[in-house]
Amino acid sequence: MAKEKFDRSKSHANIGTIGHVDHGKTTLTAAITTVLHKKSGKGTAMAYDQIDGAPEERERGITISTAHVEYETDNRHYAHVDCPGHADYVKNMITGAAQMDGAILVVSAADGPMPQTREHILLSRNVGVPYIVVFLNKCDMVDDEELLELVEMEVRDLLSEYEFPGDDVPVIKGSALKALEGDAQYEEKIFELMAAVDEYIPTPERETDKPFMMPVEDVFSITGRGTVATGRVERGQVKVGDEVEIIGLQEENKKTTVTGVEMFRKLLDYAEAGDNIGALLRGVSREEIQRGQVLAQPGTITPHKKFKAEVYVLSKEEGGRHTPFFSNYRPQFYFRTTDVTGIIQLPEGVEMVMPGDNIEMTVELISTIAIEDGTRFSIREGGRTVGSGVVSSIIE
């Protein structure tokens, strides 16, 4: 069978289903693929079992089960993630294994918001999922219109509580199972949901359009030409003649100009996100730059020591710690290309963290690193990974 050509003319977004166990996330995922396929003949209609039997993947040593499906509307192409278990969501969202530009929060109209509904909204807030659209599922099981309105209000309040715009979030009422069974009235609700997703979740900015940043992996001197920093461009573009800042691991940021860009020993005019390059830097001595720093467009990212982070602590089975840790625990925090020691403070009322838990903690590093909300890191101890985290807010 010939492979279908990937249509680049459509914009692309990554989304996922979130919500409490058994509220219908996987059924909804199956319904979206099925209903859209039926209409356009594009994509693949997936059955519940095909999605539910997601294989385990290992992302940075963490075992996660995730189902990846794709489908398209008239306006956009979507990559959609759905996870079988609550723990898989926690790991997925914290490690960034599944980047989400937006999420569909599935809430059973028959049950209303439940503990994991709240936890997934909090996680979305902390790991930087920017937009949420709500699907009230199982509405065929609720005869009372007032009850539906009550559940909708509860969900909106919950979203507002975690700083999402609860009053403006689109809420679609439907039944994933009925849509999957081909009930026209409920198929229409799937189209309504996807129209809301198309409209409400903006097309993400491409990595190449963001401000330039490159983590420094290695540094060497070329006699007579100067100092070269090598690494993979994480975002944006850099051109010969651009001014950049060297950030992190030192008191002052240093500004310099890129006088040459090389890739595979060839000289380039510019490099962009994804390229592995060497950047020749004017007037920078070998001692003034080191692995673990970043090169960035001036003023776009700043060095910090203290931040809040959402962290998943690896279980013993995943090769993590066998024992809990407490406040003042001092492991290494691995940011991009280097380890920095940091001190952990647990939230008030939390005495210790067990392997397999997730928690929001405060971290203070011993030296500054270029970080921002959404920067991901690993926690390491003697070279092995014991946790995975994402910066949820900068303190100083």
UniProtKB/Swiss-Prot annotation:
Q: Which residues bind Mg(2+)?
A: 26
Q: Which residues bind GTP?
A: 19-26, 82-86, 137-140
* Region spans: G1: 19-26
Location of region: G5 = 175-177
Q: For this UniProt entry, which segments traverse the membrane?
A: none
Recorded GO molecular functions are: GTP binding; GTPase activity; translation elongation factor activity
Region annotation (G4) ranges: 137-140
Chain positions covered by the region annotation G3 = 82-85
Q: Recite the UniProt keywords alphabetically.
A: Cytoplasm, Elongation factor, GTP-binding, Hydrolase, Magnesium, Metal-binding, Nucleotide-binding, Protein biosynthesis
Q: Ranges for the tr-type G domain?
A: 10-205
* Protein name (record): Elongation factor Tu
